[in-house]
Amino acid sequence: MGSFSIWHWLIVLLIVVMVFGTKKLKNIGSDLGGAVKGFKDGMKDGSTPEGTPASTTAATPPAGQVTNQQAHAADPGTIDVEAKHKG
């Protein structure tokens, strides 16, 4: 009673095809496949090959964001909490 038979799943599939159509389902499938591929590529090892330079986006802060060096230059009496961890 808790599990569905093959006939239940076929009826659900038939209703989904009738509602969305085969073209829309194909587009959804290709979009989902592209998203999964992008996710897998993103989850691969973050190291870059030796011949490829590292990305410079991490070195440049976004406009309007204050870096640690700028913050310490503005107020030398502040303490960097991240630097005071027990090692």
Curated annotation (Swiss-Prot):
MF GO annotations: protein transmembrane transporter activity
Record note on quaternary structure: The Tat system comprises two distinct complexes: a TatABC complex, containing multiple copies of TatA, TatB and TatC subunits, and a separate TatA complex, containing only TatA subunits. Substrates initially bind to the TatABC complex, which probably triggers association of the separate TatA complex to form the active translocon.
General function of this protein: Part of the twin-arginine translocation (Tat) system that transports large folded proteins containing a characteristic twin-arginine motif in their signal peptide across membranes. TatA could form the protein-conducting channel of the Tat system.
Low complexity: bias regions: 46-64
Protein name: Sec-independent protein translocase protein TatA
UniProt KW Lipid biosynthesis keyword: no
Gene3D superfamilies the UniProt entry points to: 1.20.5.3310
Family: Belongs to the TatA/E family.
Domain of life, per lineage: Bacteria
HAMAP family given in the database record: TatA_E
Locations listed in the record: Cell inner membrane
Key words, A-Z: Cell inner membrane, Cell membrane, Membrane, Protein transport, Translocation, Transmembrane, Transmembrane helix, Transport
Topology class, membrane: Single-pass membrane protein
Organism this protein belongs to: Paracidovorax citrulli (strain AAC00-1) (Acidovorax citrulli)
Membrane-spanning intervals of the chain: 1-21
Protein encoded by which gene: tatA
Cross-referenced PANTHER family: SEC-INDEPENDENT PROTEIN TRANSLOCASE PROTEIN TATA
Positions of the UniProt region annotated as Disordered: 40-87
GO biological process, one term: protein transport by the Tat complex
Cellular component terms (Gene Ontology): TAT protein transport complex
